[in-house]
From Swiss-Prot:
One of its GO terms (biological process) is L-tryptophan catabolic process to kynurenine. It comes from Anopheles gambiae. Its cofactor is heme. Pathway: Amino-acid degradation; L-tryptophan degradation via kynurenine pathway; L-kynurenine from L-tryptophan: step 1/2; Pigment biosynthesis; ommochrome biosynthesis. Its EC number is 1.13.11.11. It comes from the Eukaryota. This is Tryptophan 2,3-dioxygenase. Substrate binds at residues 57-61, 128, 328. Signal peptide: none annotated. Homotetramer. Dimer of dimers.
Length: 392
């Protein structure tokens, strides 16, 4: 047996035809690397005082913008998949795949911030003056991303509500922003999808009515238990806690109270969409609700990671310029960025708060036989799928 490392053997293995010698598009041409890799314009170099870390600053922010573009690309495709009233399971799988891709990209963006932190505040000061009045506040793609997700103008902090003014000299940017403010956002489409959750029909399973009965029974049992408490202080404390719980549940069972909370910006979903989200959460172990529950988890992941990215950005800015200086674009810098960490910027805030309304597993309304069949998948029975259709 001949040695595989002999030169003749290696030569024969490597003797394939070199594709680069054929006519056609090469790697660099396909990726347009001549444009991408020549886009790092260092103003410190042009000013005859080159600052090494300016190159890192430019490359990192250009990478952010490329990833923002990919997230927007995925968001647009997801919104398109959600735009139809009838969503097949195969489409839901595609939505999950693309939402997960956005989550993975956002994790990468969060991890990019520490790379910028390898630059010291003094290093940044060496070229900061070249940036003014440029600012991350002027990132058109990030504003488009926020709008496409569902951040509404009224939920932005006061300074951020006038975010379009920085694009006044760019009619194309203003038009794109206007489009994203009027077209259905991902949050809008998810809300309509949740409103169609099977089992909410009052003349069907009527989950909401059954859930309300379960809560009333649970609170009555807890109240009876509290009344049997011998120690007055403990009894009063338990009764007070039950009264608070009753008020919390009233905020979801009374549509007017819920709508008032939406008007105040403390909730996002319509009353019926919130019902759908709670139902999916309770029955997530049922086969037909497995994918919808995963979808809700991914939406929260997206909100969480954007908040983490904002937080990391805030800490980095404080390290670089402190908490008193103005940002290069004229904002209050650190103070403004810190204000964006509030719940006002959480698009899917209601999903985070669903745990407030959970009840013990044994108190969850049992599914009827008909509903149990509707939420289960039959294997190899086309007639079953014809009868039950897809989830929403």
């Amino acid at each position: 047996m001949s040695c595989p490392m002999r030169s003749g053997f290696v030569d024969s293995v490597q003797g394939g035809h070199h594709l680069g010698s054929e006519a056609g598009m090469l790697y660099g041409e396909y990726l347009m690397l001549d444009k991408v890799l020549s886009a790092q314009r260092m103003l410190s170099v042009e000013g005859k005082k080159p600052v090494h870390d300016e190159h890192l600053f430019i490359v990192t922010h250009q990478a952010y913008e490329l990833w923002f573009k990919q997230i927007i690309f995925e968001l647009d495709s997801i919104r398109d998949l959600f735009s139809t009233e009838h969503i097949e399971e195969s489409r839901t799988l595609e939505i999950l795949k693309r939402l997960n891709r956005i989550v993975m990209i956002l994790k990468l963006l969060v991890d990019q911030v520490p790379i910028l932190e390898t630059m010291t505040p003094l290093d940044f000061m060496d070229f900061r003056d070249y940036l003014s009045p440029a600012s991350g506040f002027q990132s058109l793609q990030f504003r488009l991303l926020e709008n496409k997700l569902g951040v509404k103008s009224e939920h932005r902090v006061k300074y951020n509500q006038k975010y379009t003014e920085v694009f006044a000299s760019d009619p194309g940017a203003i038009e794109r922003i206007g489009t994203t403010e009027t077209e259905p956002s991902l949050a809008d489409l998810v809300q309509k999808w949740l409103e169609r959750t099977p089992g909410l029909e009052q003349d069907g399973f009527n989950f909401w009515g059954k859930f309300q009965e379960s809560v009333e029974q649970l609170l009555a049992e807890q109240e009876a238990s509290a009344m049997s408490e011998e120690h007055e202080n403990v009894r009063e404390y338990r009764l007070m806690d039950i009264d608070k719980r009753r008020e919390v549940y009233k905020s979801i069972f009374d549509a007017q109270v819920h709508d008032a909370l939406v008007a105040r910006g403390e909730r996002r979903f319509t009353h019926k969409a919130l019902q759908g989200a709670i139902m999916i959460t309770f029955y997530r172990d049922e086969p037909r609700f497995s994918q919808p529950h995963q979808l809700l988890m991914l939406l929260m992941d997206i909100d969480s990671l954007i908040t983490k990215w904002r937080y990391n950005h805030v800490i980095m800015v404080q390290r670089m310029i402190g908490s008193q200086q103005l940002g290069t674009g004229g904002s209050s810098g650190y103070q403004y960025l810190r204000s964006t960490l509030s719940d006002r910027y959480k698009v899917f805030l209601d999903l985070f708060n669903l745990s407030t309304f959970l009840i013990p597993r044994q108190s969850i309304p049992p599914l009827t036989n008909e509903m149990q069949k509707a939420l289960n998948l039959a294997w190899g029975s086309p007639a079953h799928f014809a009868r039950n259709g897809s989830l929403h």
